[in-house]
Amino acid sequence: MGLPVADFTLLLATTDEFCLLQPLRDRMKLVLRYEFYSDEELAIVLLHRITALRWSVDDVVLVHIAYRSRGTPRLALRLLQSCHRVARSVDDKTITAAHLHRACELEEIDDLGLGPNEQKYLRLLEAGPIRLNVVASMLALPTRTVSQVIEQFLLRAGLIAKDKSGLRELTAKGRDRVSNACQQTV
């Protein structure tokens, strides 16, 4: 006995297509893989949001928020919202670079958009290459979270690399980042 079902289109969105069952993946007619947004595209997204909400912002702030957002609109919009909260807390009508700086301080976000876990991850690798399970235990996070959430941007940004045996290590760019961060805190 069959059920009559009208024609329909099923849209799937995932960041890990291999978590889907093979029969479902086989039935996909079209697979699209999107790239991360550029800083310029993120600035446009932010400008649209600011216009829709009728907020006032210094133009330079948009560029700095976009740069800290890792190519991801939701991160850019979240940081914009944080800046707006900071501006409102001091009764300012315009979001300025000072508000962005304070929002980043409160959320412990550095100038590249790295949060506390990513910053700690980089400092752990300063001593030398480490296996994923060791990094995860030192961060008190599941290995899957470390590999899929924390490492994703660090690899894309060229701050870390994986060697043939699976050890995580800092790249030259990553070492520069850690040494510069240490100098700024001193």
Segments and roles (model prediction):
Residues L12-T15, F36:
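Flexible glycine-/small-residue-rich
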Residues L62-R68, R74-S89, K120-L124, E151-Q152:
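C-terminal helical "lid" of AAA+/P-loop NTPase domains
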Residues R85-G128:
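Conserved alpha/beta core segments of nucleic-acid transaction machinery
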Residues M1-A13:
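AAA+/SF3 P-loop NTPase mechanochemical coupling elements
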Residues D58-D59, S69-H84, T94-T96, L114-P116, ...:
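The conserved phosphate-sensing helix
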Residues E126-V186:
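Terminal-proximal interaction/regulatory segments of ATP-powered molecular machines
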Residues A6, C19-W55, D59-Y67, L77-R78:
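Conserved AAA+ ATPase core "coupling" helix
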